[in-house]
From Swiss-Prot:
Catalytic reactions on record: adenine + H2O + H(+) = hypoxanthine + NH4(+)
Domain of life: Archaea
Gene3D superfamilies reported in the protein's UniProt record: Metal-dependent hydrolases, Urease, subunit C, domain 1
PANTHER family: ADENINE DEAMINASE YERA-RELATED (PTHR11113:SF6), N-ACETYLGLUCOSAMINE-6-PHOSPHATE DEACETYLASE (PTHR11113)
Record's keyword terms, sorted: Hydrolase
Family: Belongs to the metallo-dependent hydrolases superfamily. Adenine deaminase family.
This protein's record includes keyword Hydrolase: yes
Residues forming coiled coils: none
GO molecular function per UniProt: adenine deaminase activity
UniProt-recorded name of the protein: Putative adenine deaminase PTO1085
Length: 573
């Protein structure tokens, strides 16, 4: 490989000049002049072999780049001078991958999540805004979106229209959501977890959906196990995509109703291979299918978009179709294929240099026409300046009483909970303290294992949850979590996961996050946790978009009916 005048950079500050990726008129003039061979290119990849995602073949030619965009592809040699950087190599070039459905706040934070994405060749991410919007407010989240827009990965957002919990719905008023939807960094509304609001024609939800359509934004729903009638009604309301197909038949139903479908492969959902086999056997069209990885920290490091492409190819999918599902298809879905999703003139110069068609893992990346190290470490923002640091709180923990309960929340899997009316053997106590520290909900839980204490501020509501068998250690762990945020585990091993950012995210780099969450996972499983991913289990304990029962700030709730089975009790702290 020859890289002339090329510096492989691990400094993302080189990208600050192209924060919005909107070319100036001067840039457009330059790009056209380079394409006409009237002006030298900034960079030329000579004799490149690249994946032509549009015609589904490997093509070759010289690629000229100017102002961060591809200006020319073809057999002729573009104009160059002493300042033109030259790349000659034997790698195959693939388009930058797109993660179209991301949750960048699962212990890692959005910046460290970007580090992980780069490692796997993903150069554009469309992320859920839910927890940071609820905790930061409108002004700060808009500022934070602009900071994220200055990172090498292109960061866009999907704006939630409901809270996914029994609280905070007042924050999703039409006026507030309208301002967010108008932002240039927002491409979509959703995911919509509160789909009954649509079916029941709740006014605020329908106004937000109407405005999303008016602004040309996509609208994504969350409908696992939904009937065809429900999916019909959601599509009639304007829904454009869903990520919760569980079987190949689910995929077919969604496609038949006009949906775009995200095919998911994550630590809690490994349906992708079976879905793809069905899709191939049924000869379903592929142009409305996209790949997504929705995993927890330890999982994301091992299963990125490059791995999903590899899985798709190994299942029997045409390799070019697999790459399209990770690049062109999501670009078309989000109406950005004029600037992204493939290697062609006018597109941003985001590319992965890979060894061959069957190995999508990047050896190195090009982002905005600049070669960078795929192990790049990104500088964090001023978390305090964005209002994102957890605010320390002190309480008299002895004023909290853990009263016993008869019923048991038992875990069918790592995210689905049912309810028994009696206390089950091998269950432990679980208590939720509301984030205002004014109420407590108490029950038992089965499936988490057996240990002394586990306290956490890491959940959808931002409330405080403590589980265990030792009241003294439970109070000690809870006091620490209320004071500093994070996860505290006391059992056969003591673990402390600091979550200094809003009480749900670590300020550590991605490697550190992976190591501590792997240790937590291993320790939980060694303590009898029955499933694979305790991080997800903790996150979703009070999330009302999952069956069948949840422990929430409003009490123990039957999800389907929203009926309060057990009410909270007042605290006097």
């Amino acid at each position: 490989m020859l890289l002339k005048n090329i510096k492989i950079s691990n400094d993302y500050n080189i990208f600050m000049i192209i924060a919005s990726r909107k070319p100036s008129l001067k840039d457009i003039y330059k790009i056209i002049k380079v394409s006409k061979f009237d002006e030298p290119a900034d960079l030329i990849i000579e004799d490149a072999s690249y994946i032509d995602i549009y015609t589904k073949r490997i093509s070759s030619g010289n690629i000229a780049i100017a102002s961060g965009r591809i200006a020319y592809i073809g057999d002729e040699m573009p104009l160059k001078n002493n300042d033109t950087r030259i790349i000659k190599n034997d790698f195959l070039i693939a388009p930058g991958y797109i993660e179209g459905h991301a949750h960048p706040f699962q212990i890692y934070n959005p910046v460290t999540f970007n580090e992980i994405m780069i490692r796997h060749g993903t150069s554009m991410v469309i992320s859920d805004d839910l927890p940071i919007y609820i905790k930061m407010g409108l002004k700060n989240i808009k500022r934070f979106m602009r900071f994220m827009g200055r990172l090498p990965v292109k960061n866009f957002w999907s704006v939630r229209l409901d809270s996914q919990s029994m609280i905070d719905m007042e924050k999703f008023s039409y006026i507030k959501i309208k301002e967010l939807l108008n932002d240039d960094y927002v491409l979509q509304a959703g995911e919509i977890t509160g789909w009954p609001y649509i079916i029941n024609m709740e006014k605020n939800m329908l106004k937000n959906i109407y405005n999303s359509q008016f602004l040309g934004k996509r609208i994504e729903t969350h409908n696992p196990g939904a009937s065809k009638n429900t999916l019909n009604r959601m599509a009639a309301a304007g829904i454009t995509s869903d990520h919760e197909a569980i079987t190949g038949e689910d995929v077919k139903t969604r496609l038949s109703l006009g949906y775009h479908v995200f095919l998911r492969y994550s630590s809690i959902r490994k349906d992708l291979k079976d879905e793809l086999k069905y899709i191939i056997d049924e000869k379903l069209p592929l142009n409305r299918l996209m790949l997504t990885n929705d995993g927890s920290p330890y999982y994301n490091d091992y299963m990125g978009m490059d791995d999903l492409i590899k899985i798709a190819i190994s299942t029997g999918l045409n390799p070019f179709d697999a790459y399209s599902m990770a690049s062109l298809n999501p670009a078309v879905y989000y109406n950005i294929d004029g600037i992204y999703g493939g290697i062609a003139p006018g597109r941003l110069a985001d590319m992965n240099f890979i060894r061959d068609l069957y190995n999508p893992e990047p050896v190195f990346l090009m982002l905005d026409g600049k070669i960078i190290d795929k192990e790049v470490k990104l500088d964090p923002p001023d978390w305090k300046g964005y209002g994102m640091l957890y605010k320390n709180r002190n309480i008299d923990i002895n004023k909290i009483n853990f009263n016993g309960s008869d019923e048991t929340l038992f875990m069918r899997n790592q995210v689905i909970m049912d309810l028994n009316k009696y206390k089950m053997e091998d269950s432990m106590e679980i208590h939720l303290i509301t984030k205002d520290l004014k109420r407590i909900v108490s029950s038992n839980i089965h499936g988490m294992g057996q240990f002394d204490a586990l306290a956490s501020s890491y959940n959808i509501e931002g409330s405080y949850i403590v589980i265990g068998s030792s009241h003294d250690l439970m109070k000690k762990a809870l006091k620490e979590v209320i004071k500093n945020g994070g996860i505290v585990f006391n059992g056969n091993k003591n673990i402390r996961i600091e979550l200094k950012i809003l009480g749900i995210m670590s300020d550590k780099h991605s490697d550190d996050v992976r190591n501590i969450t792997e240790e937590f996972r291993s320790t939980m499983r060694g303590s009898g946790y029955k499933f694979d991913d305790p991080v997800y289990s903790m996150l979703f304990l009070n999330s009302i978009n999952l069956p069948y029962y949840r422990i929430t700030s409003s009490g123990i709730v039957e999800v389907k009916t929203r009926k309060i089975i057990k009410k909270p009790v007042s605290l006097k702290i």
